[in-house]
């Protein structure tokens, strides 16, 4: 199902942002999280999680 696929793709971007942050590449981590926030339009836990991670990077 397409919605499930979109969810897991977005979830993978959150994990990718975590990996960037752990490697010290905060610019790429922030860019990845902002992209998720700007482009993911479902009402579930993805955008709040992205916002929380972004706040921790600032």
What spans do the regions from the language model cover?
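Acidic, polar-rich low-complexity tracts and alpha-helical solenoid repeat scaffolds
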Residues: 1-58
